[in-house]
A protein has these predicted regions:
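N-terminal presequence-like segments and the immediate start of the first folded domain
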Residues: 1-33, 71-75, 86, 92-105
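Short, well-ordered alpha-helical segments
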Residues: 21, 31-81
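Charge-dense, low-complexity polyampholytic segments
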Residues: 80-88
Length: 105
């Protein structure tokens, strides 16, 4: 599956548009990670645990979107974008969504 943020794939013209596809992930925050992240922020370090969680969640959203596109008969997704927001009580969860257009190239 080709996945790109652009609307065109070089040397691969779109043959058929299949429709809009989405991927969603909602991840709860972990108290220990929050505590350690706060300590790192105080001393100026980066929060590796949050970065790892974010990368994992983003990949899960992409995987879900890719699976949906594949079920539609697509072999590529163009125009992909991501949105990040916090949801839940006291914004305790991170929601990552991605969307794009499923196509055949």
């Amino acid at each position: 599956m080709i996945i790109t943020t652009t609307m065109h794939i070089e040397n691969k013209p779109v043959q058929e548009y299949k429709g809009i596809v989405f991927g969603e992930v909602v991840e709860g925050r972990n108290f220990v990670k929050d505590f350690m992240s706060g300590i790192r922020d105080i001393v100026g370090g980066r929060s590796g645990s949050y970065e790892d969680s974010l990368m994992s969640a983003r990949q899960a959203a992409l995987d879900g979107m890719s699976q949906r596109a594949s079920k539609m008969g697509a072999n590529a997704i163009i125009g992909v974008s991501f949105q990040y927001s916090t949801v839940g009580a006291q914004n305790g969860m991170l929601m990552i969504t991605c969307n794009g257009t499923a196509v055949v190239v």
